[in-house]
């Protein structure tokens, strides 16, 4: 039987574009895990996506995932928009290249390994776990240990 994992993610960007980070809080039974990382130059949407991607990629076996985000961009993108983007060769309905295509492809692949249910929560509304991941993301964005977001294109 597959494990059920609760995942909460958030992204933050100081400037947009600017330094950014993601925060992840994972719960499996009584086990909890926090992850975060900051990047030198990125956007809030990339950090929202990367939080979800990293959370899914760290799981070594297929799981049942309930992932909660405050990003409508990520939730709608993966649940609705991505199907047509792939049919159109990663072009929008306006025939323009999909932004953050590197991360959309990675998120699509990461989701395929699991059974994922996406949930949306309003940011900064007092939701316990969303506040935790928001703090993790902001702290990561402001840290000295920043990586290069190699896929970021201004």
From Swiss-Prot:
Catalyzed chemical reaction(s): Endonucleolytic cleavage to 5'-phosphomonoester
The keyword Lipid biosynthesis is annotated on this UniProt entry: no
Cellular component terms (Gene Ontology): cytoplasm
Positions annotated to bind Mg(2+) 1: 10, 48, 70
Co-factor remark: Binds 1 Mg(2+) ion per subunit. May bind a second metal ion at a regulatory site, or after substrate binding.
EC number: 3.1.26.4
GO biological process, one term: DNA replication, removal of RNA primer
Localization: Cytoplasm
Class of this enzyme: hydrolase
Similarity annotation: Belongs to the RNase H family.
PANTHER family referenced in this protein's UniProt entry, alphabetically: RIBONUCLEASE H1
Function: Endonuclease that specifically degrades the RNA of RNA-DNA hybrids.
Protein name per Swiss-Prot or TrEMBL: Ribonuclease H
Organism: Pseudoalteromonas translucida (strain TAC 125)
